[in-house]
Every structure is written in C-alpha cells, then in structure tokens.
Design a protein with these regions (language model features):
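Structural motif
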Residues: 16-17, 55-57, 97-102
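Short, basic/aromatic-enriched C-terminal tail that caps enzymatic domains
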Residues: 89-105
C-alpha cells in the first residue's frame, strides 16, 4: 500500500512494478525481477527488494530512476523501512544474515 492508500502490484517473473496514477495502474521505470517487498517513504521514493537477484533498489519518486542500495546477497527478502534512522533492515534468508542498509544515498 502506498502513501495514498493505493495498492502497489509486483510481477514476480516479469519484473514490472505497477503503481496507481490518475486512477490507473502504471508501471514504474525499470525491471525488478523477483520482487519480494516494496515500501514507500514519506518523500514518495520506492524501495524494492528482489529475492532472486539479492538486490535492493531505491526508486526516485520524481524521475523513477533506480539506484542499487545493496546487491550480491543470496536472497533479499521482505524488509523493514526505518526511515527515522535512514535505513532498511533487510534479511538475507539463505545466508542467515540481517543487514542495516543506508537509504540516504
């Protein structure tokens, strides 16, 4: 659910992420295959994790350009956005690790 209460839909195999704009679902720029989690911060930026690629992206709310925050994990699963501390708490389930990922890049 985004900041306006709209649903966000991820296509696990195709890698598309759909968000509601002007009453219609529209894809964000980029491909996020294996998307597992999505969250939106107070500035409207999106964070998407990919279980299959072990990557987490930050997607700019205006330009929709994506920045890799972390990659090379065995499996980037659901995460917890701790915006007041400027981080995501991210489990790598396959490796048995939890990472604190800086979101202010």
């Amino acid at each position: 659910i985004d900041n306006s209460g709209n649903i966000m839909v991820g296509s696990f195999f195709l890698g598309n992420y759909l968000v509601k704009r002007d009453g219609r679902l529209s894809p964000l720029k980029g491909q996020f295959r294996g998307a597992d989690a999505v969250e939106q911060d107070s500035k409207g930026n999106y964070y998407v994790s990919s279980w299959t690629s072990g990557t987490v992206w930050k997607i700019d709310s205006i330009t929709e350009e994506s920045t890799v925050l972390i990659d090379g994990l065995q499996s980037a699963a659901d995460f917890y956005l701790e915006e007041d501390r400027g981080r995501l708490l991210l489990p790598d389930m396959m490796a048995g690790m939890i990472y604190a990922v800086d979101i202010d890049r």
